[in-house]
Design a protein with these regions (language model features):
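Short beta-alpha junctions and helix-cap segments that line functional grooves
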Residues: 313-316
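Conserved acidic residues
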Residues: 325
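TRNA-recognition modules of translation machinery and tRNA-sensing kinases, especially anticodon-binding
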Residues: 2-309, 332-369
Length: 369
């Protein structure tokens, strides 16, 4: 079985996603419960990096009913006017879109099956548009390339797979570069970054161009644009394929998704060895109680119905395939002294902690990048 088919098999079993095919082309990725959580975390981290933590003001926008999602300038007219008011008409400021549902008009005929999964016909775009001071846009173009590459690498189990292409200049003098990820079947282009300058305004009449004038000090200028774009589907597939690993374990191989803890759909789940009905019920009640405390603290937690009803190893298989960074291992001794084992997906080793400290300890572990 090929690598991508092994990944897709786990995706189906553990409710990540299923590709929907129409006429031998992938129309969309249909997400399951686990996949929805992974998508949500990817989008949240993209927004944090591109909106929340930026030095300049970044405003979100959303194109309704515009399936092709090509030139956004006119659709940004109202948003741009509002942004100028918020910024006292002064550059720089930016826009970000993480919700527009787009459709590829001319779906490329891809020979490699794996590549089709990265480019479904319908996708949710993640687009960032920086409106720069004219004298600073070139420097910002270089800066933004580095920032976007750092973002991909930060959440990767294999940061070395990401690279920037050489900057290309087209016939109109527009510069562009791509971020690519290396996989066993070849390179995937996962994000494009363009130095658009003022080209987006060229097809507008003078009255419409007036709308997009902003100030640098006392000067009125047309902003120079730097644009980057990827999609939620690309990011989903990148981190899915990046995180998948087959690791040696007890003279065997274990399949695992090594997600960054910020992206992992579930941060923690519970496991317990096979026990008699009475002990199994007590362990289940304890896991529910501890799980409620974690959930109230905002920690995505999974309470498994198989706790103490299947072998411990089979429960670990589930947590590894779900990419859960930490598994709280309960046993009969836990009921007596409150000590549990906290298993790491990376090392499979267990750290002993008291149940009273579990929530605060997990909060600390997942807080940092």
């Amino acid at each position: 079985m090929s690598l991508i088919n092994r990944i897709l098999s786990i995706c189906k079993t553990y409710a990540y996603m299923q590709p929907i095919l129409i006429n031998n082309a992938i129309d969309l990725l249909k997400y399951g419960a686990t996949g929805e959580l992974l998508c949500q975390n990817i989008r949240n981290e993209w927004l944090y990096s591109n909106v929340t933590s930026r030095d300049e003001n970044v405003f979100q926008f959303y194109n309704t009913g515009q399936k092709t999602c090509n030139n956004d300038i006119l659709s940004l007219k109202e948003s741009f006017t509002n942004a100028k008011q918020f910024c006292n008409n002064q550059l720089p400021f930016s826009f970000a879109d993480s919700r527009s549902l787009c459709q590829q008009e001319n779906l490329k005929c891809l020979d490699v099956e794996e590549k089709k999964l990265f480019s479904p016909r319908n996708y949710t775009r993640l687009k960032y548009i920086a409106f720069c001071i004219p004298e600073e846009n070139q420097q910002y173009f270089y800066h933004w390339q580095r920032q976007r590459k750092i973002w991909w690498r930060k959440f990767s189990a294999n940061p070395g797979r990401f690279s920037l292409t050489e900057i290309c200049t087209d016939d109109n003098g527009l510069e562009s570069t791509e971020i690519r990820a290396e996989f066993p079947w070849g390179q995937e282009t996962i994000e494009t970054i363009h130095n658009v300058n003022t080209k987006m305004f060229d097809n507008l009449d003078l009255v419409e161009q007036e709308t997009f004038l902003a100030r640098v000090g006392k000067r009125k200028v047309l902003p120079h644009l730097v644009v980057s774009e990827t999609s939620l589907e690309k990011a989903f597939m990148v981190f899915l394929c990046d995180g998948y690993a087959e690791l040696p374990y007890h003279n065997d191989i274990r399949e695992v998704f090594r997600f960054h803890r910020k992206l992992a759909p579930y941060k923690i789940m519970f496991a317990a060895p096979l026990s008699n009905a009475k002990k199994a019920d007590e362990l289940k009640q304890l896991s529910v109680y501890l799980g409620q405390s974690l959930k109230k603290s905002g920690v995505s937690t999974l309470i498994s119905p198989n706790l103490a009803k299947k072998s411990l190893e089979s429960q670990f298989v589930d947590s590894d395939c779900l990419g859960v960074p930490y598994t709280a291992v309960l046993n009969e001794t836990t009921l007596e002294n409150g000590i549990l084992g906290l298993r790491s997906i990376e090392t499979t080793l267990e750290e002993k902690i008291h149940v009273a400290n579990l929530t605060s300890h997990i909060e600390l572990l997942i807080k940092n990048y």
